[in-house]
């Protein structure tokens, strides 16, 4: 009995010391409103119970406490904001370049340590090295890939015409994966069997889901717990399948034929990574990790952006008809018509539709930054060093204080120049902002617009599912609890 009492006393003393050592943190953090949660656990239990509905979890507290709130993950503070002014403070601060280390660990444990996982001071040099892979002249050289793979997609969609409502998401994912793999790794990847049969889409989807699980339920990152639950084997099996494709292509790059600067593939991701490998700056495994992460980041978001745009237009036929009229004016002949960059620049209405889609259903629902030093926000609040701040894109884009009482409604006219002039520049952040914004934002817009040109010019889209009935799932990338089926009818 004495031993138990002694242990309890020692434990209590350690807990008091722990709280006392963090008194400045608590003093500063408790100035921010938000749910206190349970003792010791904070809001962790509610997070675990509602981890598939965390968007509604954040909606509830942002509406209750204001646009910047404090939650507690156990003893760890986590700030969430939808306030454009605070978003600007974070994205523009040199002390907020680092991503949350917890999220970085969750992703790199599944996909390796690429650009996405780099922190200060290393991320900037790596980012500069890969910037040429996303310059416009290189993106324009990808048009033949967009064209070929979109033709394959259209041939598949043709088989669904007048067949009732069908699930188009798997086809969208395969279409986008094949484009992302080729634009990341070059034409050699087309000869890989896993690429040809599209089986790697499921493996990448599994890794993305596993990364999300690591983020939302940190205990799963423990190797023993992961093994007991079977997640470790599942991750290893899927990663192994992806590695085989990566090895097949990367091995051919170790001793390549000389390339000239005029070679259109000289600046693609794999070749930029191989430059670092030959200099001894990164390992062979790092080359594969860069390719793996770039493919994963590129294909999932582009595919679902196209799908979400189709679904929203199916729910708003007047806007779909306006898009069709615009497309018909630029591409009078249906079928497999050619698309050039000047053609795409004429499509102002379609551009606004894509932007409005990304406002309502952003590809990434939330991103997180960790303060490297104390950061003073424009509202006067001081955020201590080491605190994680979640920039909630989903709720920033639906903030009624910025977008008005109809913030949840689909309206492409939100992006008319005269309407955007009235908005805070950080009110719309689908690809983040600042020095560490999304490196592939132009690629995502270009590939999505290309596919939507062909699909919406050739088909009328409808659905029996209402937009208001969508259930959003908080994932590493935006997901829906269920993907409504779409009906395709041919246009002339």
From Swiss-Prot:
Species: Drosophila melanogaster
Subcellular localization, as worded in the UniProt entry: Endoplasmic reticulum membrane; Microsome membrane
Annotated family: Belongs to the cytochrome P450 family.
Enzyme Commission identifier(s): 1.14.-.-
Record membrane topology: Peripheral membrane protein
Full protein name: Probable cytochrome P450 313a1
CC cofactor: heme
Primary location class: endoplasmic reticulum
Keywords linked to the UniProt accession: Endoplasmic reticulum, Heme, Iron, Membrane, Metal-binding, Microsome, Monooxygenase, Oxidoreductase
One Pfam short name: p450
UniProt-annotated binding residues for heme: 438
Enzyme class label: oxidoreductase
Coiled-coil residue windows: none
Free-text function comment from the UniProt entry: May be involved in the metabolism of insect hormones and in the breakdown of synthetic insecticides.
């Amino acid at each position: 009995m004495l031993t138990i009492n002694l242990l309890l006393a020692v434990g209590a003393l350690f807990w008091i010391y722990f709280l006392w050592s963090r008194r400045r943190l608590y003093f500063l953090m408790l100035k921010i409103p938000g749910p206190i949660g349970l003792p010791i656990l904070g809001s962790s239990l509610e997070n675990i119970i509602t981890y598939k509905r965390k968007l509604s979890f954040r909606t509830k507290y942002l509406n209750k406490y204001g646009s910047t709130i404090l939650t507690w993950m156990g003893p760890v503070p986590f700030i969430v904001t939808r306030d454009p002014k605070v978003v600007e403070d974070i994205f523009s601060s040199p002390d907020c370049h680092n991503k949350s280390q917890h999220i970085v660990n969750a992703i790199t444990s599944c996909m390796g340590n690429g650009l996405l996982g780099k922190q200060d001071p290393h991320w900037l040099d790596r980012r500069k090295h890969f910037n040429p892979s996303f310059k416009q002249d290189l993106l324009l050289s990808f048009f033949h890939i967009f064209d070929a793979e979109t033709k394959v997609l259209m041939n598949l969609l043709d088989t669904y015409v007048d067949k009732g409502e069908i699930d188009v998401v798997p086809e969208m994912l395969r279409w986008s994966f094949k484009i992302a793999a080729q634009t990341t790794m070059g034409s050699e990847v087309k000869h890989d069997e896993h690429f040809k049969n599209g089986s790697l889409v499921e493996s990448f989807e599994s890794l993305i889901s596993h990364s999300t699980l690591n983020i939302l339920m940190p205990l799963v990152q423990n190797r023993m717990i992961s093994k007991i639950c079977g997640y470790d084997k599942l991750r290893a099996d899927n990663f192994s399948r992806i590695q085989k494709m990566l090895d097949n292509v990367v091995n051919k790059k170790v001793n390549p034929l000389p390339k000239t600067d005029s070679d259109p593939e000289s600046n693609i991701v794999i070749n930029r990574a191989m430059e670092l490998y030959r200099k001894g700056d990164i390992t062979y495994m790092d080359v594969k990790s860069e390719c793996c992460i770039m493919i994963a980041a590129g294909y999932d978001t582009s595919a679902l952006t196209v799908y979400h745009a189709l679904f929203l237009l199916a729910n708003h036929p007047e806007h779909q008809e306006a898009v069709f009229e615009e497309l018909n004016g630029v591409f009078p002949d249906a079928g497999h018509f050619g698309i050039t960059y000047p053609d795409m620049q004429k499509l102002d209405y379609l551009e606004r539709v894509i932007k409005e889609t990304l406002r309502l259903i952003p590809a990434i629902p939330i991103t997180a930054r960790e303060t490297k030093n104390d950061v003073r926000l424009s509202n006067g609040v001081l955020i201590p060093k080491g605190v994680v701040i979640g920039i909630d894109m989903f709720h920033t884009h639906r903030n009624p204080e910025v977008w008005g009482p109809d913030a949840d409604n689909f309206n492409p006219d939100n992006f008319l120049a005269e309407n955007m002039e009235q908005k805070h520049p950080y009110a719309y952040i689908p690809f983040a902002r600042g020095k560490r914004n999304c490196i592939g934002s132009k690629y995502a817009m270009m590939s999505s617009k290309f596919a939507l040109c062909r699909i919406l010019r050739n088909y009328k889209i409808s659905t029996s599912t209402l937009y208001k009935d969508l259930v959003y799932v908080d994932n590493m990338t935006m997901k829906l609890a269920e993907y409504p089926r779409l009906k395709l009818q041919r246009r002339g």
